[in-house]
Curated annotation (Swiss-Prot):
Gene Ontology terms: biological process: transmembrane transport
Record protein name field: Cadmium/zinc-transporting ATPase HMA3
Segments crossing the lipid bilayer: 120-140, 144-164, 171-191, 193-213, 340-360, 371-391, 683-703, 707-727
Organism placement in taxonomy: Eukaryota, Viridiplantae, Streptophyta, Embryophyta, Tracheophyta
Gene name of the encoded protein: HMA3
MF GO annotations: ATP binding; ATP hydrolysis activity; metal ion binding; P-type cadmium transporter activity; P-type zinc transporter activity; transmembrane transporter activity
């Protein structure tokens, strides 16, 4: 299909202005105007449905090149998207759309943040052509109906004709031109039905292919439209454009709003959903000094955020630029296919012309058969399916990776991921958490320096460093009531792989590992220091050439690191640790990992890591390097695939890496490798299928069985199959390789829970005595797996007043079971949405035994008579974010106690003015602590309150309200009846958190 003017690849970037003009920095990312530095520039996204293969890339470029003000054009065939960077005054959007639509490319401007998904219904041209063609099949009943086949051609051909003539006028041979030639040939041969079938099949297949492509690109479009366009200045309440927010401005983010900027929380507390960036499916608690990123969702609290980056430099903006660069890159396989396709089309067209003309010139018999054979070959000259086989699969795989929080910088990287045979891990911040703590700190020498002075100097210098150890030293000094002052530090220097240096108050201070001793010309022996101080990592402080202090630090391995390395081993991949830390620290980390690392290399400089990565490539083959710091940048660039860890990692690591994990979950590494291998298999199937179908059609035609409509169906149908096969990479049920129990442990919020879950995973499946009745899910007490049968859930029978058992539907209750009973951990637990259920109950997330429960809540259910959000933890557990769902039609909504004898936070009943009884039960019982507990507003006011608990002064369990009278029933006891119907109803609808009652006071 592609002619001599075909672009070198499916994606192309065309610079249309001279270098001096093109050097102007873009002022906009993802839609909208930008200003400053010259004329305004705008980036516009267009859905161009007429772009189906590489020939249209050159066509789009030639159409937009003559327009004044157009600077850069990017065409992404896989998603049928054209990105134009232009001056809106000289080249408005309407002019760009008009230029493309003149060629019949069906262009439209994509609204900011929209998905670009086309209508699910076929166009009138397709419908009319199909109806007329179907009617023509009855010509055996009434021969004149054969004319309806010609009418089907006339009805369905206009889009093909517009695009075909536009391409032909620019000397471009695309699929529309080839199909029009085939239709004309069939009409000349008198095969009217076949001509109509060609038009109908081609237009229908193109519509289905467009629908599939736009559906595949919808996720990427939404990813690029996450950033809100407005922000609220906290100090004034003024609503401004995010592009007008400057570094240092404080913006207000209310519950349910998108965070508009990257920054640091300065006021308020909340939970933020970061799945759009990191792929993590649970919210992250935020409090003052926590980092937040633009495009994430603030769940349930107010926070004030001090801006740390401009909108164009935010993480979302960087992601957008990364995505565009990835879409415009081509893999080795794609470049090879494009090169072959460039010669395939002209060669087949020449052969088809020879098949048609030579027999005619020689006066051979059966010319009609020769001409049909030529037409079949002409239709087969379009290599659309072959050309699409690689970019569409790569596009879908990169989109799937982005949903998992893995950003891959192009098709070459994706292919290399599937070939990895060895992985080198940095230790600090990659295998370990990078959250150091100072175990001990000692003065050495003749103690001329006082401890307070030395800590002040160290903290002031380390305040200028971003290394994880620096934060530990600053925190240690602050724990001694010493505040750093980095403004007093002069001549600050960083020595990668060694440490840092700074001058303060006339003192020359070196802080680092034992190499720092040699740099500072300190005569002390590290062996002597090692005998004096014991620790995992040892650091030294040299003041004016003399060793002044020695300290030890500890750092724990990340949860899931050992399992990730075992996963890599199951894939036949070698795992190696490369660290600049001491051999003792490396050995300690290996012990925490259970000895899963096959090689350890310690006390390395950045150049040593590069040398070792090159050695791994020579020994094992394609090698991946995973790191997060400045020291890893060179090794990341040297590896076949360099992977940087986390959005908070160093900028140098993210810039030089080939892929970025937006979270710090090491389990994403084997997921990325599995995805790369799956993408390679998909591409291989696409290429093999495309070639096989072409070969079969040509072989059938050569066997003197040329069927024109079958050739068309094979051509466009193969394109559709290639797209659909590639979209299998987007399936949500596709597993990247992390085991479910390991993923659950990786998301545990406390070290105690991670240790408990890790121990549980190694224990026998039989439940112990303290966990009778608990549900076993591979050692991790997570929510039931999708598709689990109803008998695996406990149904609690809670009926409204007057309801009879026989009136209830077959499935009377939907229950979200506790996520983490008996000391387990529960994440993302909630009742399923079920409009016909009579009762929906969200059970406690984190049952007895100190379990942890997060995001527990009943689902919204308009037809439910009662919705109860049960306690999010019991028996010393911890409940976070527990609340009853908002439900205007419910008879009673009860927010039960958050933390029975443990700690309950942010527990509140939903606001519900029309509710007959709304009760916010006590937050914290049995001496526990309850915070943020309040009853919803209701009229008439409730009577009675209770406080205190059997735990004495251990905490305050404050029962906010009761109904009419403070009568409650025992937690876990049977129902209690009372003379008051309302009180009895209260006790039946939910278990209370008090055991006794005395004069309006309920003892917890």
């Amino acid at each position: 299909m592609a002619g001599k003017d075909e672009a070198e690849g499916l994606e192309a970037r065309l610079l249309l202005l001279p270098p001096e003009a093109a050097a102007e920095e873009p002022t906009r990312c993802g839609g909208g105007d930008g200003g400053g530095g010259g004329r305004k520039r705008k980036k516009t996204y267009l859905d161009v449905l007429g772009v189906c293969c590489s020939a249209e890339v050159a066509l789009v470029e030639r159409l937009l090149a003559p327009l004044d003000g157009v600077r850069v054009v990017s065409v992404v065939v896989a998603s049928r998207t054209v990105v134009v960077e232009h001056d809106p005054a000289a080249a408005p959007e309407s002019a760009i759309v008009k230029a493309l639509n003149k060629a019949g490319l069906e262009a439209s401007v994509r609204a900011y943040g929209s998905s670009g998904v086309v209508s699910r219904w076929p166009s009138p041209y397709i419908v009319a052509s199909g109806v007329l063609l179907t009617a023509s099949f009855f010509e055996w009943l009434f021969p004149p109906l054969q004319c309806l086949a010609v009418a089907a051609v006339v009805a369905g051909a206009p889009p093909m004709v517009r695009r075909g003539f536009a391409a032909a006028s620019r000397l471009s041979l695309d699929i529309n031109v080839l199909m029009l030639i085939a239709v004309a040939g069939a009409l000349c041969l008198g095969d009217y039905t076949e001509a109509g079938a060609i038009v109908f099949l081609f237009t229908t297949a193109e519509w289905l292919e467009t629908l599939a492509c736009t559906k595949a690109s919808a996720g990427m479009s939404s990813l690029m439209g996450m950033l809100p366009v407005k922000a609220v200045i906290a100090t004034t309440g003024e609503v401004v454009s995010v592009r007008d927010v400057r570094v240092g401005d404080v913006v207000a983010v209310r519950a349910g709003e998108i965070v508009p900027v990257d920054g640091v929380v300065v006021d308020g507390q909340s939970e933020v959903d970061e799945r759009s960036l990191t792929g993590e499916s649970f919210p992250v608690p935020k409090q003052p000094h926590s980092e937040v990123w633009a495009g994430t969702m603030n769940f349930d609290g107010y926070i004030a955020v001090r801006t740390t980056a401009l909108a164009e430099n935010s993480t979302v903006a960087k992601m957008e630029r990364l995505v565009e660069a990835a879409q415009n890159s081509r893999s080795k396989t794609q470049r090879l296919i494009d090169s072959c396709a460039k010669y395939y089309t002209p060669a087949v067209v020449v052969v088809a012309a020879g098949v048609a003309l030579i027999p005619a010139l020689l006066g051979a018999d059966g010319l009609e058969q020769w001409w049909k054979l030529a037409l079949v070959m002409l239709v087969s000259a379009c290599p659309c399916a072959l050309v699409l086989s690689t970019p569409v699969a790569s596009f879908c795989a990169m989109l799937r990776a982005a949903r998992m929080g893995i950003f891959i910088k192009g098709g070459d990287v994706l292919e290399s991921l599937g070939e990895i045979r060895a992985v080198a891990f940095d230790k600090t911040g990659t295998i370990t958490r990078g959250e150091f703590s100072i175990d001990s700190f000692h003065l050495v020498g003749d103690h001329k320096v006082e401890m307070d002075h030395l800590l002040y100097w160290i903290a002031s210098i380390e305040s200028k460093s971003s290394h994880p150890m620096a934060a530990a030293l600053v925190e240690y000094a602050q724990s001694k009531s010493i505040q750093p002052n980095p403004e007093n530090v002069g001549d600050f220097r960083i020595y990668p792989g060694e440490g840092i240096y700074g001058e303060i108050h006339g003192k020359h201070i070196y802080i680092g590992n034992r190499r720092t001793l040699a740099r500072a010309s300190s005569p002390q022996s590290t062996q002597e220091m090692g005998e004096m101080i014991k620790g995992v990592s040892i650091g030294y402080v040299i003041c004016d050439g003399e060793l002044a202090g020695v300290f030890s630090l500890s750092d724990d391995c990340r949860t899931g690191a050992a399992e990730a390395i075992r996963e890599l081993g199951s894939l036949g991949i070698k795992s190696v640790m490369l660290t600049g830390d001491s051999s003792a620290a490396a050995t300690h980390a290996q012990g925490q990992l259970g000895g899963v690392m096959e090689e350890l290399h310690s006390e390395l400089l950045p150049e040593d890591k590069v040398r070792l990565v090159s050695g791994l490539k020579a020994r094992f083959g394609p090698t991946m390097m995973v790191g997060d710091g400045m020291n890893d940048a060179a090794a990341l660039a040297a590896a076949d695939v360099g992977v940087s860890m986390g959005i908070s990692g160093s900028a140098a690591a993210m810039e030089t890496s080939h892929a970025t994990l937006m979270s710090s979950d090491v389990l994403r590494v084997p997921e990325a490798v599995r995805l790369g291998r799956c993408a390679r298999r998909t591409i291989a199937v696409n290429v093999a299928g495309s070639v096989a179908v072409k070969a079969a059609v040509l072989a059938l035609a050569a066997a003197w069985r040329p069927v024109l409509w079958a050739a068309v169906l094979a051509d466009v149908g193969t394109c559709l199959l290639v797209v659909l096969n590639s979209m299998t990479l987007l399936r949500e049920e596709w597993k990247g390789g992390a085991k479910e129990d390991g993923a659950c442990r990786a998301t545990a919020r406390s070290l105690v829970m991670r240790s408990q879950l890790a121990a549980d995973s190694q224990a026998p499946n039989a439940a112990d005595a303290g966990a009778a009745g608990r549900e076993q899910t591979n050692g991790c007490r997570c929510c039931p797996k999708p598709g689990m049968s109803p008998e695996h859930s406990v149904v609690i029978d809670i009926r409204a007043d007057g309801e009879r058992q026989e009136e209830r539907p077959a499935e009377a209750a939907v229950v979200a079971k506790c996520c983490g009973g008996g000391g387990g951990e529960g994440i993302r637990c909630g009742a399923s949405k079920k409009p016909t259920a009579t009762v929906v109950v969200a059970k406690c997330c984190g049952g007895g035994g100190g379990g942890e429960g997060t995001r527990c809540g009943a689902s919204k259910n308009p037809a439910t008579a009662a919705v109860v959000a049960k306690c999010c933890s019991g028996g010393g557990g911890e409940g976070i974010g527990c609340g009853a769902s908002k439900k205007p039609t419910a008879t009673a909504v009860v927010a039960k106690c958050c933390g029975g004898g443990g700690e309950g936070t942010r527990c509140a009943a939903s606001k519900k003015p029309a509710t007959a009884a709304v009760v916010a039960k006590c937050c914290g019982g049995d001496g526990g602590e309850g915070t943020g507990c309040g009853a919803s507003k209701r009229s008439p006011p409730a009577e009675g309150s209770c406080s205190g608990g059997e735990g004495g002064t251990n905490g305050v369990g404050r029962c906010c309200t009761s109904v009419k009278r403070p009568t409650c029933c025992d937690m876990g006891a049977a129902e209690v009846s009372d003379s008051s119907p309302e009180t009895a109803k209260d006790c039946r609808n939910g278990r209370c958190c008090a055991k006794t009652m005395n004069s309006g006071e309920v003892k917890g």
